[in-house]
Amino acid sequence: MAEVAPAPAAAAPAKAPKKKAAAKPKKAGPSVGELIVKAVSASKERSGVSLAALKKSLAAGGYDVEKNNSRVKIAVKSLVTKGTLVQTKGTGASGSFKLNKKAVEAKKPAKKAAAPKAKKVAAKKPAAAKKPKKVAAKKAVAAKKSPKKAKKPATPKKAAKSPKKVKKPAAAAKKAAKSPKKATKAAKPKAAKPKAAKAKKAAPKKK
């Protein structure tokens, strides 16, 4: 049973690429409505273009009218309801059709108005690019303030205090200088011994 279960799981991913491949051709090329508008605009007939003439022009442009006959009719109806086409003869998809000049002229100014908006948006983008300059200026100000904080360390003061401790050996030297005085005091009694010798020498004179 464990060997049979992985087989459906392997088959499922294989189906997904087929759906993607089928979806790609739909995106390529202009829509049916665009082709119909081009065909009607190309015709010079004052009374309008019939549905049969539209199909011939679409077929000449490489569009498969036989397979997409229903799409052509739906597209014609939708263009009439939108106001892009005006139906001069007949009803529904059958009859003759003309371009609605007012609708076409209204679309052109709308496209021109959309173009300046795009330019304004492009002009606003450089303004957004200027913001990093302000950030850079703030960083520069922060960099200027940081040296002030660097001055706070009191290590040089401690180094200046240390020489005071060095002066203590000088006091020890003074004590050492005082000690020879004591040595001289101790040496004075030695000098008194010759006096005693002189006294002994003077004793024989009494005899």
UniProtKB/Swiss-Prot annotation:
Name recorded for this polypeptide: Histone H1
Temperature-related activity annotation: Thermostable up to 80 degrees Celsius.
N-acetylalanine: residues carrying this PTM: 2
Tissue specificity annotation: Oncorhyncin II is expressed in skin.
Domain of life: Eukaryota
Region spans: Disordered: 1-28, 105-207
Cellular compartments per GO CC: extracellular region; nucleosome; nucleus
Keyword DNA-binding set for record: yes
Example of a GO biological process term: nucleosome assembly
Record keywords: Acetylation, Antibiotic, Antimicrobial, Chromosome, DNA-binding, Nucleus, Secreted
